[in-house]
Regions:
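Serine-hydrolase catalytic core
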Residues: 35, 245-409
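Alpha/beta-hydrolase active-site loop
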Residues: 93-183
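Short substrate-entry loop that stabilizes the transition state in hydrolases
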Residues: 46-55, 63-66, 79-82, 226-227, ...
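Conserved alpha/beta-hydrolase
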Residues: 66-87, 145-152
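Short amphipathic alpha-helix adjacent to the substrate-entry channel of hydrolases
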Residues: 54-74, 93, 142-145, 214
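Hydrolase active-site cap/lid region
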Residues: 208-276
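N-terminal cap/lid segment of alpha/beta-hydrolase-fold proteins
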Residues: 1-39, 100, 160
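Short beta-strand element of the alpha/beta-hydrolase
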Residues: 37-47
């Protein structure tokens, strides 16, 4: 019989920024209690995974039922990054002071009064802006394809914000530790982490911060270096719609670059300054760090897909990372996708993610990984790992029932 369960636990605070976490960590599991369980499999959703919770539950059930595993979804810190079909997990689109400042600047270009501009009047102001721009284009006073750029902010639920990577990765290990405490018979099973885009990045990052709790990684298009547009994108020079912020919404004569709420900034006098060490710890393409990881566990199987033409996360960084892992003795399979590998079924395009849904990714790669891991005992043994990053040392370690980050000068 297929069993579905949900748990809420305490996890980690934001150690980097000194912010106390107020939300609980939720994770959901699915398993068939009539079958012999082969592994613990974490299905890691990327940006937008919260949009359809029913769909999320259904393909977790599919994986648990078809592959005899405990399938786990962790609703990690800042999991709620988009509008959701379940209000509890929905983000709110809003306009911050920075957004309103830019909108006002654009409106004044067209002599539109701004004395009534506020969060609840932005839409009506933009409708008026669209009317004026339509008229100017009809009069050939604006190029027909000209667009203005506006900005908006996504406010995640549960009082969360975009920390990017570290807290979300720690959440998965805390969920694992809670899971095996509740179900001790699962403790020695192989542990597999996988997902696409940000989910793939988190799977790779988990292998970095807690390699002794990882047996396999299934990655599709995870970034080997942190994409800064998702962290401090608001402060970066604008280059294109696709690389500015988290996403954009298209209007008739303007588009809206959307940014997830974050505390990170490049303002050096801020307590939330995103410094070099914060970048280094999130970077997977770091030879010295990969050597330290390999000293803790070389028995991780890596399977990765990446488009050679990926416009968001350059393939050459992933290629270099996987080459180093292979030299260090890891079992690595990197599938670099070019136009000859597009089959219209599994691989649909050369865009970011290659058009591969998570369900299809696991359906193809999970049986092969389970076969390789058959009979492996993966013991839950406490450990720690230290990564020098500039003037800081990031220490990830087990502390009783918890997994924690400590930063030392």
């Amino acid at each position: 019989m297929l069993i579905n369960q949900s748990f809420e636990i305490d996890s980690c605070d934001d150690v980097e920024l000194g912010i106390k976490r107020t939300s609980k960590l939720e994770y959901r599991i699915s398993y068939d209690d009539e079958k012999e369980i082969k592994a613990i499999v974490f299905i890691i959703g990327g940006y937008g995974a919260n949009a359809n919770i029913y769909f999320l539950d259904s393909y977790r059930n599919y994986i648990a039922k078809n592959f005899d595993v405990v399938a786990v979804h962790v609703f990690y810190h800042c999991f709620c990054q988009r509008r959701s079909d379940v209000e509890k997990y929905s983000t709110l689109a809003d306009f911050t002071k920075d957004d309103l400042k830019l909108i006002e600047k654009v409106l004044r270009k067209y002599n539109i009064p701004c004395d009534q501009l506020a969060n609840n009047t932005v839409v009506s102001h933009c409708e008026y802006l669209s009317e004026i721009m339509t008229e100017l284009k009809m009069l050939n006073r604006l190029p027909y394809d000209f667009e203005e750029r506006l900005t908006a902010t996504f406010i995640p639920s549960r009082g969360e914000y975009q920390n990017f990577g570290i807290m979300a990765a720690i959440d998965h290990i805390n969920a694992l530790k809670d899971l095996v405490k509740r179900f001790p018979k699962l403790a020695d099973l192989p542990k597999i982490y996988g997902g696409g885009s940000y989910g793939g990045y988190l799977a790779l990052l988990i292998a970095k911060i807690a390699p002794w709790y990882v047996d396999g990684v299934i990655d599709n298009s995870g970034s080997a270096v942190p994409p800064l547009n998702y962290i401090i994108g608001r402060e970066l020079e604008f280059k294109s719609k696709d690389t500015n912020g988290d996403m954009y919404m298209q209007g008739d004569h303007f588009f809206v670059s959307c940014f997830l709420k974050t505390h990170w900034t490049r303002k050096e006098n801020s307590p939330y300054f995103f410094n070099n060490e914060n970048y280094f710890i999130r970077t997977l393409l770091n030879k010295d760090h990969l050597i330290l990881q390999s000293q803790k566990n070389k028995n991780i199987i890596y399977v990765s897909y990446h488009s050679k033409e990926d416009p968001l996360t350059p393939a050459n960084f992933k290629q270099q990372t996987m080459q180093i892992l292979k030299i260090l003795g890891y079992d690595v399979s990197l599938n670099l996708i070019d136009e000859n590998k597009i089959d219209g079924k599994f691989i649909k395009n050369l865009d970011h993610g290659c058009g591969i849904p998570d369900k299809a990714l696991f359906r193809k790669e999970l049986p092969l990984m389970l076969e390789k891991l058959q009979g492996r005992k993966s013991l839950m043994q406490e450990n720690s790992i230290s990564y020098p990053c500039g003037n800081k040392v990031f220490i990830f370690k087990d502390v009783g029932d918890k997994f924690e980050l400590v930063i030392k000068d």
